[in-house]
Design a protein with these regions (language model features):
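N-terminal lobe/hinge region of extracytoplasmic solute-binding protein
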Residues: 40-90, 118-121, 191
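Surface-exposed binding/hinge segments that line
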Residues: 132-180, 184-204
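Long beta-strand-rich cores associated with HINT superfamily self-processing modules
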Residues: 512-534
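Periplasmic-binding protein-like
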Residues: 297, 301-341, 385-389, 493-504
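Extracytoplasmic/peripheral linker and loop segments enriched in polar/acidic and small residues
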Residues: 352-355, 405-416, 444-514, 534
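Ligand-site clamp/hinge motif
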Residues: 219-271, 403
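Structural transition elements
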Residues: 196, 327-367, 383-388
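Ligand/substrate-recognition segments at binding pockets and active sites
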Residues: 205-207, 245-246, 264-266, 362-438, ...
Length: 534
């Protein structure tokens, strides 16, 4: 019998033996009292501008320090957040918004309507829903310091939904002097109006970041409800500790050095469940859809046959055994609209086969003219499920004669490299794996995966004009049944040109100390208000 390092680790943990804790945590353990929460997120924060980047960790940062005009409640209905009052004209073309009282920036200056106008304009440069909004806008303008209007060329019933969407990049409101710069240039000030203030003095890039309670933040009067309602902060400080090794992060949790681990090792779920001081908690009940993004701009995936090869190659069940070995947390997904949305369907899914179809994939690569070009797969070493999925994918590609090469880095390095549109010889890439909330796949106007507008689309830059013409109809379709019909047509085209490849769906619980309660259960983002620590 072969005993692996992981087997030994599980045995030592089950016996109550703490693993070595990073010295930085031992030295700072006095900080983790009841008024301080220490969290290990699933990735290191390397990009701070939540409009510049769609990375989830950057959006979490944005949710802490910025605020939003509208927010989704627990039933996914948009509710006013920074907005105090709003109304729409009889012809449904002019919306008027008035900010609520008590809004101020962390530098003590007041939030104004001009900040909101600039922020909407910047966000709309990069968010799919925002781009749709700008296509319909006649004008967006400040009326006075607290009031602004959006005038439309034609009615857009989804307008408030778009402003409240949690599809990244989220519409976080920034100071006008920050939001006036193009979305392609990073904002570095980290000054928002949200419930937490970024502590610049305690920032240790690559090691830890601290967020302090904004004592001047005035939450709404309503009870907290999803991302909506009053954002009440019950602790003085949140510290994000960057612990790249998942086993070490878990050991720190078990030893009480941290309170929250976003991505605990899947094979340690039973250990966590049996620990009287720890709990697993699923924050996104809809789950996450794993997605393989291919670079449409470079060989071999500029050829549709090569993309179709990937569709046939993938064995979702094998990937799920790696990423979600407990079947209660994982299942296949074949619809671009996910498993849990009203628009999930089986149109054009004949390619799906238990175990995949490697021989068909080999033939399609041959028809694509594949000639041994290097296929570079970006692999984040600090996100276990993506790391392991990339490892399995590379091995599967090599078995059918594809020259697959892994490019390991941390998640921050992957985020930077995936923006490179050049060939692999110039630091580009061929494939990376990521995920998005299944819930978000029900809105193709905002879902980053479902945009196929070429170089204006999300990383991978899929392009198909026929599909995009159908997607453009989505906001104006009146009934649920009509949208379901449109969804089938869109999916039929998508799986022909293969805008991406879905790898399966999983629910990813966080691990926390039982002393930490009140964590908001919503898709996509981790909110840090409402938490309490005993």
């Amino acid at each position: 019998m072969t005993i692996t390092r992981r087997d030994l680790m599980k045995a030592s943990i089950a016996a109550g033996t703490a693993l070595a804790i990073p010295s930085v945590l031992r030295a700072q353990s006095g900080l983790a009292g009841p008024r301080t929460v220490r969290m290990v997120m699933g990735a290191d924060l390397s990009v701070f501008d939540p409009i510049f980047s769609t990375a989830g960790i950057t959006a979490y940062h944005g949710l802490a320090i910025y605020d939003t005009l509208f927010s989704l409640d627990s039933k996914f209905m948009p509710q006013p957040q920074m907005v105090g009052k709003w109304g729409v004209s009889e012809d449904k073309k002019t919306y008027t918004f008035e900010l609520r009282d008590g809004l101020s920036w962390h530098d003590a200056t007041p939030v104004t309507a001009a900040d909101c106008v600039a922020s909407i304009r910047r966000w709309s440069q990069v968010n799919s829903g925002g781009k749709l909004l700008m296509e319909r806008i006649r004008d967006i303008s400040k009326k006075d310091d607290k009031t602004f209007t959006i005038e439309l060329k034609e009615p857009l019933g989804l307008l408030i939904d778009l402003l409240a969407s949690v599809s990244t990049p989220v519409l976080f409101i920034m100071r006008a002097k920050d939001a006036d710069r193009p979305a392609t240039e990073q904002v570095t000030a980290n000054i928002g109006s949200g419930p937490y203030k970024f502590n610049h003095d305690l920032a240790k890039p690559g090691a830890s970041f601290a967020y302090d309670r904004n004592e001047k933040y005035a939450p709404r009067g309503e009870a907290s409800d999803g991302y909506a309602g009053g954002k009440v902060v019950n602790v003085d400080r949140i510290i994000w500790d960057n612990i790249g090794d998942e086993q070490t992060a878990f050991a720190a949790l078990q030893a009480g050095e941290v309170d929250f681990v976003e991505g605990p090792p899947v094979d340690l779920y039973p250990v966590i469940e049996s620990d009287p001081n720890l709990a697993l908690q699923v924050l996104d009940k809809s789950g996450y859809d794993m997605c393989l993004r291919m670079n449409f701009l470079q060989k071999p995936f500029d050829n549709v046959k090569a993309r179709q090869a990937m569709l046939h190659l993938i064995d979702q069940e094998a990937l799920l055994r790696v990423t979600a070995p407990d079947p209660k947390y994982g299942r296949p997904v074949t619809s671009i609209f996910g498993n849990t949305t009203p628009y999930s369907n089986d149109e054009n899914t004949g390619w799906f086969k238990k175990g995949g179809n490697p021989e068909m994939a080999r033939q399609l690569f041959k028809e694509a003219g594949y000639a041994g070009e290097k296929v570079v797969i970006l692999q984040p070493a600090n996100i276990a499920w993506i790391r392991d999925a990339a490892q399995l994918l590379a091995a599967t590609l090599r078995k059918i004669g594809v020259n697959a090469e892994l490019a390991p880095s941390d998640w921050g390095g992957l985020v930077k490299r995936r923006a490179n549109k050049g060939p692999v010889e110039s630091g580009g890439w061929s494939i990376f794996i990521t995920n998005d909330s299944d819930y978000l796949q029900g809105d193709p106007t905002s879902a980053i995966f479902l945009n196929a507008s070429g170089e204006k689309a999300w990383f991978g830059w899929p392009k198909n004009d026929e599909y995009e013409a159908l997607r453009a109809k989505w906001p104006d379709v009146g009934t649920l049944e009509e949208r379901k019909d449109l969804a089938r047509k869109m999916q039929g085209i998508w799986w022909d040109f293969v805008g991406d490849v879905r790898l399966g769906q999983f629910a990813q619980p966080i691990a926390r100390s039982k002393a930490l309660t009140g964590i908001i259960e919503m898709p996509q983002l981790v909110a840090m208000w409402n938490m309490q620590k005993a």
